[in-house]
Amino acid sequence: MPTMSIRGVSLFVEVVGHGSPLLLMHGGPGLDHVSLTPFRELADRHTVILYDHRCNGRSTGAAVESMTFENLTADADALREALGFERWAVLGHSFGGHVALEYVLRYPERVSQLILMDTAGDARWSQEHAAEILAGRGYDAKTVAVARRFYCGRITSNDFVRASFRLLPAYDHQFSLLRLAREMLEGGWRMKTRPEALIFGGKMMRGWNVMDRLGEIGVPTLVLAGHDDFLFPPESQALLAAGIPNARLRIIERAGHNPQSERTAETIRAVADFLALATVPAPRDVGTAVLRPAPARA
């Protein structure tokens, strides 16, 4: 490490900590695991595995056309086997949540707990509704038009950086250049983007939908999201949680698409508490249980 040969692809992998394993699947596509590094704080009680999907970040050796759910999930399971874990908890953020859903549906016996963070069971929220949500929040017509193209992969590599910066403030509850600068100094500068993966992913995701299969998920599941996420707003999270038997729903206030960055302590605590309590079934008389913060530890 930090690279491992998995199914003929060189995956960038970081493993930290000790305890029961937790795999982190990053979003994008076209990004890397850096946005999920706040979860390294769980390394005192879990073996935390961060990696870059094939064709993303610093993972190399695969053509972008190979970035299919079949390959992405097979890569993850081959990584599990290579690391010697029988089962592991899986946290998927945004696009990584789509991969996590595909993974638990294809390899159900390998997942002990599932955390779906700011994601959905279909593509329509990001590809069909995000631009309209931005318009409703008062964003200018140019930003709305960029969003309509960006999340469907209808941009060029040359447009990627410019479009990303235009959309950047929309990801937060309250955009802060100071916080962005701090995050960059704390390691955000290491993020490696791959525009070709975003462009291909936008096309790959068109029509993707596993909402009718959510009832097959039999592991303890937490649906976790920022209240002000324009890509996956609370109503999408309620639908996702309602479709998964006994799923728990937690909405983080004053946070957007990346609650792990805006409300770090609260988000990490929600994940830690869920992993500790996941063996306790959610109430059966309520389709979706809300996981309340635990009392402060001494």
Q: For each of these PLM feature ranges, what is it?
A:
Residues 7-61, 65, 79-80:
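Conserved HGGG/HGGXW glycine-rich cap/lid loop of the alpha/beta-hydrolase fold
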Residues 50, 54-95, 269:
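Active-site loop/oxyanion-hole signature of alpha/beta-hydrolase fold enzymes
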Residues 86-128:
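Conserved hydrolase catalytic core segment
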Residues 114-153:
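Flexible "cap/lid" loop of the alpha/beta hydrolase fold
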Residues 150-199, 204, 213:
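Conserved alpha/beta-hydrolase catalytic His-Asp/Glu region
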Residues 217, 223-225:
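Short beta-strand/loop motif that positions the catalytic acidic residue
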Residues 230-236:
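Conserved alpha/beta-hydrolase "acid-adjacent" motif
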Residues 247-298:
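Catalytic active-site module of serine/aspartate enzymes centered on a nucleophile-bearing elbow/loop
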